[in-house]
Design a protein with these regions (language model features):
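Transmembrane helix-loop junctions at the membrane interface of multipass transporters and ion channels
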Residues: 69-71
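Mg2+/Mn2+-dependent nuclease catalytic core
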Residues: 1
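Feature 926 captures the class I aminoacyl-tRNA synthetase adenylation module centered on the KMSKS loop
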Residues: 13-52, 56, 76-348
Length: 348
């Protein structure tokens, strides 16, 4: 801090102008026990060794997210491993995208206008979410909250683009509808490009490498314009619809997991929505089939005809029912429970 003040006063005195517009002062990097790193304690960490083992990007990611602005941070190797795993996730997601870009004829004239009519609810949702994250990250960067901005970019990349959108889009990529496939590829590459640019200041090496394989761009990412918010990409209604569908899928998955139902076992899902939630559920039928192991999705106006033993899940304005006889093999379940009872009795 002292040298900053000294330089500022010297520049004002000698040149009558500020030496720099902004100064960002960060805390110390301490060891995992909170001690200052020193030769006498022997607790110093050689960054070159970490880079050799995990890569420079993993170290940069760790240092950027390890603390809140202005505070000291504790250095944990587990956080470097966590960062390395994220970089691997980004690399594998990008490889998946590139594997589906091998048919160059699908990329001819691939623009928003050319695929607009074939964009699905999921496409619009991920484009809108990417746009919103871009806005938030830009704000955090302007406020010098670099760690918060990186965390938001990380959460979006891992939890929404990789875990949800890529899984949602697979049936279209593997299908035979050419225009549906083009719309999916456009969305995949459009959002991936934004992700790479958002992450580039933090993990420059892997993002530059991945960017070089994108057939939809030219030049280097380091000279590309940083993403900015675009009002045309803001689709809040689609986000709300998709969030409701995803919430329903999560709850169905939780029910199946609690009952030890394998993903390979399909089961019918009956949905009873309120009038305002019905359009979202209609749009989400295929997503329930592919992501919630539904053999059939039936949307009803009332609970009439639903089996009494059906397992139910309630979310915002929507009730979901799964007939128990489609989930459970009663004889096997009875056998399992009897074994657990016998084991418990033997331990008494």
């Amino acid at each position: 801090m002292t040298w900053v003040v000294r330089m500022a006063f010297s520049a004002m005195f000698c040149m009558n102008e500020k030496p720099f517009e902004h100064v960002l002062i960060h805390g110390l990097v301490r060891d995992s026990e909170g001690r200052k790193m020193s030769k006498s304690l022997g607790n110093g960490i050689d960054p070159l060794e970490i880079i050799d083992q995990y890569g420079a990007d993993a170290l940069r990611f760790t240092l950027a997210t390890g603390n809140s602005p202005g505070n000291d941070m504790r250095f944990y190797m587990e956080r470097v491993e966590f960062a390395r795993n994220f970089n691997n996730k980004l690399w594998n997601a990008s490889r998946f995208v590139f594997m589906n870009l091998e048919d160059e004829s699908l990329l001819e004239g691939l623009t928003r206008e050319s695929v607009k009519a074939n964009l699905t609810l999921a496409d619009k949702w991920i484009i809108s979410r990417a746009n919103r994250v871009v806005k938030e990250v830009n704000y955090n960067m302007d406020q010098f909250d670099l760690g918060i901005g990186l965390q938001k970019a990380y959460d979006f990349t891992w939890s929404e683009y990789c875990d949800w959108y890529i899984e949602i889009v697979k049936p279209r990529l593997y299908g035979h509808d050419r225009e549906a496939k083009r719309a999916a590829l456009y969305t995949l590459t459009y959002v991936l490009e934004k992700i790479l640019k958002l992450l580039h200041p933090f993990i420059p090496f892997i993002t530059e490498e991945i960017y070089s394989y994108l057939p939809t761009v030219e030049g280097y990412i380091i000279t590309a314009e940083y993403p900015h918010y675009e009002e045309a990409d803001d689709m809040l209604a689609e986000e709300e619809k998709m969030n409701l569908i995803m919430d329903g899928i999560r709850n169905v998955r939780n029910v199946r997991a609690e009952m030890n139902v394998p993903p390979s076992k399909k089961a019918k899902i009956i949905i009873v929505p309120t009038d305002d939630k019905r359009p979202a559920m209609e749009d989400g039928k295929e997503y329930f089939k592919s992501l919630a192991s539904a053999s059939e999705v039936e949307i009803q106006n009332s609970k009439d005809g639903i089996p009494e033993d059906a397992v139910s899940v309630v979310i915002d304005g929507v009730e979901l029912f799964i007939p128990l006889d489609e989930l459970v093999d009663f004889e096997k379940e009875k056998e399992r429970l009897n074994k657990e009872r016998d084991k418990a009795l033997a331990e008494i």
